[in-house]
Structures are given as C-alpha cells and as structure tokens.
Amino acid sequence: MTEAFDSGAFLSTVSGRPGVYRMFDSDARLLYVGKAKSLKKRLASYFRKTGLAPKTAALVGRIAQVETTITSNETEALLLEQTLIKEWRPPYNILLRDDKSYPYVFLSDGQFPRLSIHRGAKKAKGKYFGPYPSAGAIRESLSLLQKTFFVRQCEDSYYKNRTRPCLQYQIKRCKAPCVGLVEPEVYAEDVRHSVMFLEGRSHALTNELSTAMEEAAINLEFERAAELRDQIALLRRVQDQQSMEGGTGDIDVIAAFVNPGGACVHLISVRGGRVLGSKNFFPQVGIEEEVAEVMAAFLGQYFISSPERDLPSELIVNVVHEDFPALIEAIQALRGRELSISHRVRGTRARWQQLAVTNAEQALGARLANRQHVAARFEALAEVLNLDEPPQRLECYDISHSSGEATVASCVVFGPEGAIKSDYRRYNIEGVTAGDDYAAMHQALTRRFSKLKEGEGKLPDILLVDGGKGQLSMARDVLNELAVPDLILLGVAKGATRKAGFETLYLNDAANEFTLRGDSPALHLIQQIRDEAHRFAITGHRARRGKTRRTSTLEGVAGVGPTRRRDLLKHFGGLQELSRASIEEIAKAPGISKKLAESIYANLHSE
C-alpha cells in the first residue's frame, strides 16, 4: 500500500450500503473493480494486517486511491461491476477474453432457400437457429443436413450463375435447384424437415419420416422407402450422439477447473434436449484463485456483459458461490426471463456435469502442455537454479496406494517440448511395509537407476521428488549407493496451507530450502510435473487394485455362465472395456436384458 493512502481515514468515510468500488495506483491506473453488499465491510477486509492471499496483498500494496459508487441494491451493484470490468479490463480482475459473437445457422428466404453459418447482426431476411457454441458445432449440423435433406449451402452468386449441376449434386449432397432438377414443392418439404431438426424436433421428424417410409413401402415405392430409411438412420445416429436423456429444455452445463498456472471453463450447450456443441474458455486468473470465484466471474461476464448471448432456462454448474443468487437475479432482470441454477444433480445430468469437468481439466492440461509454454518455463527454471542453460530432461517420482494396498510408484519425464510419455514408467512395489512411502520410493529409484548403471535409459538433468526433507535425503542415499553421477535433486513439499502456490522447495539437500513466488513460471513447471506424476501414479494404482479386486468378477453374477461371460468379453473386447460400459451399453450386447445388465454393472462397480 502506498504511503499516500491512509486506509483508516478512508474507511471512516465509507458507507455500509451496497455498491461498487474501484482501486487505482499512484499513476491513476485502474487496478481492480469489485462489488459489495456492504462497501464498508468488504473494503475493510482488504486492509487487515494478516491473512491476505498473495494476490490480494500485491493489489493492496499498489493502492493509492479508492473510489466508491453507492447503488440501491446488490443486483444493481453487480450490473455496474460487470459494465466497468468490460470497459476497463482491470489487471487484478478475473477476465474472460474477448471472443467473436456466437454463430447461428441461417436459412434464407426465397423459393430455394440456402443454409449457412452467420455471425453478427441479424439483418438479412430469413430464419436464425442457435446460437451454437462454435463454428465446428454448426458445421457438424450442416453436414448432417446436407447428407440427409440436400438443402443447398452454396453462395447465392454461385447458385444464380450455374448452367449445369455441380459436384454436390453428383455426390448426393444437393438436388440441384440451380438448374431446375427438383420441384419447388419437394425442395420446400426438405426445407421443412431441416427446420424441424434445427428447432430440436428431431424425434417428431423421425416419426414423420418413419410413417412416410411405411406408406412408400405399401405403395411399392421402394426407392423412396430406401431414401427415407437412410434419412432415419442418419437422424437416429445423431440423436444417440446428441440427445440428453430426460431433458427437452434449454440447458448450459458449465464447469470450471483451476490448476497452477491457469483456469478453464467448459460450456456444453443443450437446446431442445439436443447438444449443439461445447466450447472452452481460458479466463485470465491469479494463481490462488478459487474455482468458485472463477465460475462466478465467468457467469457474470458471459451472461451480463454480453447480453446478446442466448440465455437457457437452466444452468448446471460444478461449484457454488455466495454471489449466485444475486447473479441470477441480475441476469433475470437484464434479460426479462426466468433462469434456474443447479449444482447437486443426479443421473444423466450428473454425468453431463462430470463430462464438463473432465473436458475443462483436459483442455487446461493440453494448454499447459503447449510446447512454447513449457520451453519458457524450462528457461525460467534454469534461471532460478542458476544453470548455464535450460535442463533437457526432468524426471519426477511419486507414490500411490490405498492404506498400503497395491502400491505403485510413477516416473514421468519432461523435456523443453513437454511430456516425454514414451519414457514414463510405473513400478509395482513389493516387499515393503504397507504404507511406507520412503521404502517404496527407495525401491523405485533403486530399480530405475540400477537399469541406468546397466546402460539402459538416459540420465536426467534434474530429479524431482514429491516430498519433503525425508524423501530428498532418501533419494540422495540411493544415488550415492549406486554411484550415480552428480545430478540436481529437487524436493517439493506442500506449504503450511497445503495449497498450490505455497510449496517449499529443497535443492540437493535439506539445508538448501527456498520458495518461489506463486506466479513464477518455474514454480508452474514444477507443479505441472509433480501433478502429472501424481496422476500417473494414481491411475496405475487404481488399475492394479482393480485388477486384483475384479478377478473373476463376472463369475459371481447370476445368469452369466461361461458361454455368456465369453460372449460379453468378446463383445466389449475385454473386462476393462466392459467395466467402462454403462448399463444401457451392456444391455445392447446380445442376450443381455436390462435387468441382467443392471446386475452386471452393479457387480463390476461394487467397490
């Protein structure tokens, strides 16, 4: 906090009413915008002597001036906050990056309408469907419609100047209205069917086509019946892929995931019970941001700062935040529509919620694995460790078990271009006291570096051990026992709060202890490798434990004898694949009823 700013004098003048506050530095640059139910209480929390998060402490240290605006209620404060964030994009706020407007499917007017992707203002005459979360999602729908109903997608200038059918006609993607090869009434029917699909009425459309197919067969119009059959097959395939069981409404499933170095919000858009697609967002965040804070900031900026975006009737999220009631009230006031938000969901909705979480986690992982991103972090690590050049190979080890059961050690390897997965290794630990992580690590390192002494594998530049002084000392003992040439040892211990960003690091021995700033790229690299070793160890442990626990699992299921057991495993390709299948997927196997599928599923997931 700058010397010029007297927080005590300032707080004595602040109102306890709802409002918005703006923090500026000594150069009058806007640092942060926030809203509060009580301005006095919220602003007082910034000037406590202890307990501030690193990012908050850094912000407070730069404050030279604070301005407030009183509002009539919390909803009004939230709306003003989002307006100011959108206009000024302060560096200490969680910021959703600018994005192009969402695309729509556009059906033009005229005797032979055209289907196309549209962004921006809706000036042209015709119908708009969407919005879709991405252009890729639209292309999937347009591709299906082109294969199914043959509505043209060419530019009007191209369409008006044709003298013979183009390639799309030859490959059965268009009926060539440009040269009069289709009657207007027939084309209009194809357009009507396309509209039904785009409006989410694909089940009604399928039923209508099924009736038409039966009539064609009765009238001995076998070619027409075959065409309708193919259309129905395409529609049912996409229904299986896109349908959301038990739902016909408009829903956005949104999951936020935060990891050292970044955050991702994944949005799945469901309209009329049909999945239109999904999209990843990567907000600008500080390292210690909580996932609920990221979610609240995203919802505000996504639905309030961009009112042109489509609003569903329900949001399904993976976290809750105290601001959600005010957020929903503000969105409803702005849009004039009802909106519900759900966190605890069951059944299919819970699976969609988990799918969004998984997608957010994987998308962020892929982003962090970007080669240039990783290379820059390697350079930062070299600077921190005073190395002449960036290391070329880092190995990290971790241990995973369940109360000593099925202990597995992992070794993951990273280079300047990212993870070297071909060099990953797992070690099934045997002959040690259950739960003795030191002995397990000793065995894993001994096996790894004994192979190195025999000429197998490469020597790492840095050996990273997930653990404190004890694990580091044990690793040093192993290297000394095997006379391994000097390499850098780095121990990573969780800090007092056990939160990411507060790790304690040990270089080569327990006496050389240090920490890095939470926003350090070098620390981000260490965290990324440590977390990958943890993930790889856990998956190996679960697989080993599961293999032990599920041996002959199917033998205990009533109604599944040797023949049916063999057929089931053949159908799914093995027990592991069968274990991943849902009840509905198991029931689709030959000779398996829904009730038997439930018994099989329950047996496989009894642990």
From Swiss-Prot:
* Residue ranges of every copy of the GIY-YIG domain listed in the record: 16-94
Q: Give the signal peptide as a residue range, or say none if absent.
A: none
Instruction: Indicate the principal place this protein occupies in or around the cell.
Output: cytoplasm
Which SMART domains would you find in this protein's record? Answer: GIYc (SM00465), HhH1 (SM00278)
Q: Give a GO molecular function annotation for the protein.
A: DNA binding
Pfam name, any one? HHH_5
Q: Which residues form the UVR domain?
A: 203-238
- KW DNA repair (keyword) present: yes
GO BP terms: namely: nucleotide-excision repair; SOS response
Keyword Nucleotide-binding present in the record's keywords: the answer is no
**Gene Ontology cellular-component terms listed:** cytoplasm; excinuclease repair complex
Name the NCBIfam families on file: PRK00558.1-5 (NF001824), uvrC (TIGR00194)
Q: What does this protein do?
A: The UvrABC repair system catalyzes the recognition and processing of DNA lesions. UvrC both incises the 5' and 3' sides of the lesion. The N-terminal half is responsible for the 3' incision and the C-terminal half is responsible for the 5' incision.
PANTHER family associated with the record: UVRABC SYSTEM PROTEIN C, UVRC/OXIDOREDUCTASE
Family per UniProt?
A: Belongs to the UvrC family.
Q: What is this protein called?
A: UvrABC system protein C
Gene that codes for this? uvrC
